[in-house]
A protein has these predicted regions:
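RNA-contacting regions in translation and RNA-metabolism proteins
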Residues: 1-152
């Protein structure tokens, strides 16, 4: 992705952090040819994540909108991570999914998760793919869509 995307995103995040009185480091990396990731690290950044990562999702959407508007480009995905939250969340979801799947296999009854974001549902579906005797499906309508684990 062009450096214009990186500089525009970095400038937006620096301004946002400054307006909130936060000091942080910003690293930018190319995940693949269609995705760039902005990683924010520092102290006391929980306010950027918010309850249920809703603030993180909102900031990511603002970041994407600013980058696409300022660079006149709508190609490529923009990912924002704060303090390694996404990797920690993924590990927690995988562990929780394994626990719920084991309970479901023992009981033979389907198990429904609470509604979650599409990215979290994907993590759960991917984790279920590695568990024998369990399948998963998503049900409901956004923003109340949720994963259901089913015995095979």
């Amino acid at each position: 992705m062009p450096s214009e995307v990186e500089s525009t995103g970095r400038e937006f995040l620096i301004g946002l952090l400054a307006s909130m009185g936060l000091i942080a480091d910003i690293e930018v990396g190319v995940v693949n040819e269609n995705m760039i990731e902005f990683r924010v690290s520092g102290r006391d950044l929980g306010v950027l994540i918010g309850p249920g990562a809703q603030t993180l999702q909102a900031i990511q959407e603002l970041l994407r909108t600013v980058i696409h508007y300022e660079t006149n480009s709508s190609s490529g995905r923009i990912l924002l991570d704060v303090a390694g939250y996404r990797e920690k969340r993924k590990a927690a979801l995988v562990a929780f999914t394994a626990k719920v799947a084991a309970e479901m296999v023992s009981s033979g009854e389907r198990r429904a998760f609470e509604p979650m974001a599409a990215a979290d549902r994907k993590v759960v579906h991917d984790a279920v793919g590695d568990i024998e005797g369990v399948s998963s499906t998503s049900e409901g309508e956004e923003p109340h869509r949720y994963v259901v684990l089913l015995p095979e």
